[in-house]
């Protein structure tokens, strides 16, 4: 059936197609702040956990106005190790996601973040003095793709699209940020623990990949006689 025929019949029935809604610009270029080199060069793989993180945030419409969700993802397993929601897209917002990632991987998980590569776009939040200073504190090396190139941060962009497709456009809009935060927490738990990932061996969920890695790389102490 021709598209024009479909549109005419939908109008007659008072129906409209599902759309992604109005686009909101979330990346503001950093002015005056040093810009790190691109250390990934579109290689979104990692040999083990805590070697490469990618970050980004996206907008989410609610009945109270636009809110924003930031993610930190480990490229080894595609696990979301940190996230945050906010009604403002400022540095404190993305720092919240970073702090959760540091707590998850280092403080709670006992991992070593020294030499980890943190990859972002040129958003002013990620290149701010407060944010980059926090990376330095943890021995994390900053990396950023070219200005305006979504391909240079494709893994993080893909995560945002999954979040929008699997949660935001399916179940939203929500009343306010509190409702969005609750829904996002549930989605992240499902994403990490249950959802199959085509980039992982056997399409395994992120936590399963990491459990398998940790099991295979646990050093067994020698038996004493």
Provide a role label for each language-model segment.
Residues 2, 32, 36, 50-51, ...:
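Hydrophobic (often cysteine-bearing) scaffold residues that line and stabilize catalytic clefts
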């Amino acid at each position: 059936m021709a598209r024009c025929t479909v549109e005419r019949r939908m109008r007659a029935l008072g129906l409209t197609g599902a759309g992604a809604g109005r686009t909101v610009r979330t990346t503001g270029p950093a002015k005056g702040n040093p810009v790190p080199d691109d250390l990934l060069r579109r290689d979104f793989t990692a040999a083990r956990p805590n070697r490469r993180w990618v970050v980004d945030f996206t907008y989410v419409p609610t009945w109270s106005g636009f809110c924003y969700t930031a993610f930190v993802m480990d490229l080894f397993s595609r696990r979301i190790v940190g996230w945050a929601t906010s009604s403002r897209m400022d540095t404190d917002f993305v720092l919240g996601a970073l702090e959760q990632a540091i707590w998850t991987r280092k403080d709670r998980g006992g991992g070593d973040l020294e030499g980890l590569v943190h990859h972002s776009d040129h958003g002013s939040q990620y290149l701010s003095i407060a944010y980059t200073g926090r990376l330095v504190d943890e021995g994390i090396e900053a990396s950023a793709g070219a200005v305006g190139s979504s391909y240079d941060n494709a893994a993080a962009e893909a995560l945002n699209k999954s979040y929008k497709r699997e949660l935001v456009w399916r179940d939203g809009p929500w009343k306010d940020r509190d409702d969005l935060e609750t829904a996002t927490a549930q989605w992240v738990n499902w994403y990490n623990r249950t959802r199959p990932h085509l980039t992982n061996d056997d399409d395994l969920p992120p936590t399963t990949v990491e459990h398998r890695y940790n099991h295979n790389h646990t050093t067994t102490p020698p038996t004493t006689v």
